[in-house]
Amino acid sequence: MIRAFALLFAAIAMLAGAGHAQAQNLFQPFFEDTRDIMGGGPGFFRPGMPSGSSPIPRTTVNFAGNFAPGTIYIDTAERRLYLVLGNGQAIRYGIGVGRDGFRWSGTHRVTAKKEWPSWTPPAQMLRRRPDLPRHMVGGIDNPLGARAIYLGSTLYRIHGSNEPETIGQAVSSGCFRMTNEDVTDLYSRVRIGTPVIVRN
């Protein structure tokens, strides 16, 4: 009798475990999605979140450049952004860069940082693309994505994107695109005044 109860208990435990695994697999894609049901919002992305949606994974690499720790170094030809850590290392991120005719180089500093920024396309862009909205509030569908880091007095930014598949491509109007996960990580590591060096 006791043995029968033990076998029954073991069978129930196995079924419960299988049911739990199936439920976990069923809901896993929902919880791994980078959007929430309200369309994103401040605080949804966490610094240090894995960059699973980037075609170019974020990683720490050896870095030979002679720049102070904390410097952002952007290599547009390589389509990579480096945050210099010091001791010969940097965090390397994949980026999208300006298409032909929109790439640039120079040295600036971070002058502003915004979470879930709104977007107002500049007049030149509206002339090229009259179909664009005149203004878009921040959110998961906004082209600037989860974070924006403003460079000097230019219109250029390092920002997130609602098109993570474009990371590694030359498709922007001069800004540097990152996945929302990666730009959130970078945003948490830099401050106003951080030097930004852009090289073609």
Q: Predicted regions: what is each one?
A:
Residues 2-200:
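N-terminal pre-domains immediately preceding structured catalytic cores
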